[in-house]
């Protein structure tokens, strides 16, 4: 149920009847304050100006045509021409009933699209670090939301599995006689990578062999391909452990690494030349883009093939976008890549559009994100100033949560304690990130994220268990409640019901904008509204059974909405805390 969409259409029709153009925007928004109703239509200002009318005069005319019978109990004009809409308690009660009768809580299924989501993208032969956290969990929240809405989602883990470094790694693997690399841990590979690089920099003979190995690998030699495959397999096996710990939905089947696009690159360069988009410049193949200027104010040159014949990330990204449209049949492509890559992506996509590889009707969206910072406001590092490994961060989260949970539940059995600590610890790390607007940097703070107050995972998980405890005390099951009517008489009942029915609107925003913090804010607000409702509207000690059961149904929908909402974020809920 999308009340905002329903009201938007009703107000739009009334505006047209009042003389507004057919493409007018009613600008219906959820009201920020209770006194302004549940929704506000703010579109009169812009339209009245075009019509040469006062906004309030237009609003008055719109009201004469606006039929919200059975939807709103009151509609009023406020200020210079805002229209405030107060939802009818009977309408709220009816739709709460409908939401409870549906597995999807009344959320409609939009027109199905094929959506490719590019996220996580770790590098082969390197362990995942905190820099991979945001892309992985924000991308996963978007994927879960889009899938819940009914879209076909293709997860694309754009792994860094190709490049000149593989000659060096294979040469070092061979030199160390480590053909048993399948048994290596990725932690070994981290040191292995450093040692290989050191050797490459200091031993010219080794470096020459490494360069030859790159050529052999790129020409498809079976032995070198097998060695490369070992390095990829070890890396992805270790990364899968991290994905599983993080409760994200990526699997080995979702790997679409850089190597996938290699066979396409010569054809892309030849085609761009044939189309007159790419030209030779100082021995390299370059596309000059008028949209981007260099310091001299001239069109910027984007290299797609180096003088030595090598390709660049841009070339791969052009091939990648083409593949996602032509082969995966994407209707929309989302890239969860940090903000520092924005210009690079814009240049690659400008070439993609000019070449006609992806039509303008298929959006290519950079859902960029900021950095994770330490309390000092600088990039998050270890005490020694090194990069924080993601596995180490999750270990620390688990350890801190274990202490916190044990303190609050000294008699809890060990296995239950471990399960709860895992849900709280991993949930805290994820929620602290997801609850921030992804476009900004954020401060990583253990104390804040593990607090039981404020917009945190522990608070949200606790809020959910608190609602469940009402049911346990009521000693009533869902079947017994099903036939009971919902009656809304108190203001706090109406406020909670209206917010519950805004779940679909929240999902729609997350799906459209790729902003999980909007869902976090909604759930936090919902938990707060339930708390006020619980305090002022007695449930178990209600004046009669009818009111008791009605309030239990509001509590029931609150629990289901909190659980489903946290689910779309990849945050685990627990029955008791």
Curated annotation (Swiss-Prot):
EC code: 6.1.1.19
SUPFAM superfamilies: Anticodon-binding domain of a subclass of class I aminoacyl-tRNA synthetases (SSF47323), Arginyl-tRNA synthetase (ArgRS), N-terminal 'additional' domain (SSF55190), Nucleotidylyl transferase (SSF52374)
Gene Ontology molecular functions: arginine-tRNA ligase activity; ATP binding
Motif ('HIGH' region): 122-132
Cellular location(s): Cytoplasm
Catalytic activity: tRNA(Arg) + L-arginine + ATP = L-arginyl-tRNA(Arg) + AMP + diphosphate
InterPro entries: aa-tRNA-synth_I_CS (IPR001412), Arg-tRNA-ligase (IPR001278), Arg-tRNA-synth_N (IPR005148), Arg-tRNA-synth_N_sf (IPR036695), ArgRS_core (IPR035684), DALR_anticod-bd (IPR008909), Rossmann-like_a/b/a_fold (IPR014729), tRNAsynth_Ia_anticodon-bd (IPR009080)
This protein's record includes keyword Protein biosynthesis: yes
GO biological process: arginyl-tRNA aminoacylation
Family: Belongs to the class-I aminoacyl-tRNA synthetase family.
Known partners and oligomeric status: Monomer.
NCBIfam families named in the record: argS
Record-given protein name: Arginine--tRNA ligase
Biological source species: Escherichia coli O81 (strain ED1a)
């Amino acid at each position: 149920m999308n009340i905002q969409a329903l009201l938007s259409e009703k107000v739009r029709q009334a505006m047209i009847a009042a003389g507004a153009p057919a493409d007018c925007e009613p600008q219906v928004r959820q009201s920020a304050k209770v006194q302004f109703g549940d929704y506000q239509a703010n579109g009169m200002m812009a339209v009245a100006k075009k019509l040469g009318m006062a906004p309030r005069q237009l609003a008055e005319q719109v009201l004469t045509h606006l039929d919200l019978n059975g939807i709103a109990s009151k509609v009023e004009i406020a200020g210079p021409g805002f229209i405030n809409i107060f939802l009818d308690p009977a309408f709220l009660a009816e739709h709460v009933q409908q939401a409870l009768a549906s597995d999807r809580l009344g959320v409609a299924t939009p027109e199905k699209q094929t959506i490719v989501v590019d996220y996580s993208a770790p590098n082969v032969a390197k362990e995942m670090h905190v820099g991979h956290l945001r892309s992985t969990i924000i991308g996963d929240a978007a994927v879960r939301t889009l899938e819940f809405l009914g879209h076909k989602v293709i997860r694309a883990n754009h792994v860094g599995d190709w490049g000149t470094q593989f000659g060096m790694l294979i040469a070092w693997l061979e030199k160390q006689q480590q053909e048993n690399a399948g048994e290596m841990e990725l932690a070994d590979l981290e040191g292995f990578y450093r040692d290989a690089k050191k050797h490459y920099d200091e031993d010219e003979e080794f470096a020459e062999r490494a360069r030859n190995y790159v050529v052999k690998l790129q020409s498809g030699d079976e032995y070198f391909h097998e060695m490369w495959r070992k390095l990829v397999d070890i890396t992805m096996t270790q990364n899968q452990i991290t994905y599983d710990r993080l409760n994200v939905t990526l699997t080995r089947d979702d790997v679409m690494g850089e190597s996938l696009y290699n066979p396409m690159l010569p054809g892309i360069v030849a085609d761009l030349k044939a189309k007159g988009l790419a030209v030779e410049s100082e021995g390299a193949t370059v596309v000059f883009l008028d949209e981007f200027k260099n310091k001299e104010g001239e069109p910027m040159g984007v290299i797609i093939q180096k003088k030595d014949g090598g390709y660049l990330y841009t070339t791969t990204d052009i091939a990648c976008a083409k593949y996602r449209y032509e082969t995966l049949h994407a209707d929309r492509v989302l890239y969860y890549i940090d903000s520092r890559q924005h210009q690079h992506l814009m240049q690659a996509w400008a070439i993609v559009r000019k070449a006609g590889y992806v039509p303008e009707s298929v959006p290519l969206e950079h859902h960029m994100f900021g950095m994770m910072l330490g309390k000092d406001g600088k990039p998050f590092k270890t005490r020694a100033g090194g990069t924080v490994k993601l596995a180490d961060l999750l270990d620390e989260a688990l350890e801190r949560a274990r202490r916190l949970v044990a303190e609050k539940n000294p008699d809890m059995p060990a296995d239950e304690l471990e399960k709860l600590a895992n849900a709280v610890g991993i949930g805290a790390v994820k929620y602290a990130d997801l609850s921030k607007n992804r476009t900004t940097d954020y401060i990583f703070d253990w104390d804040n994220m593990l607090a039981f107050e404020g917009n945190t995972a522990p608070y949200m998980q606790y809020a959910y268990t608190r609602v469940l405890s009402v049911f346990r005390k009521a000693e009533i099951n869902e079947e017994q409640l099903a036939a009971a009517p919902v009656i809304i008489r108190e203001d706090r009942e109406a406020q909670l019901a209206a917010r519950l029915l805004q779940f679909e609107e929240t999902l729609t925003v997350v799906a459209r904008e790729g902003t999980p913090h909007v869902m976090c804010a909604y759930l936090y607000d919902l938990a707060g509204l339930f708390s006020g409702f619980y305090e002022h509207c007695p449930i178990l000690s209600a004046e009669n059974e009818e009111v008791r059961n009605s309030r239990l149904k509001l509590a029931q929908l609150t629990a289901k909405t909190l659980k489903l909402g946290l689910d779309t974020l990849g945050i685990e809920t627990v029955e008791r805390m």
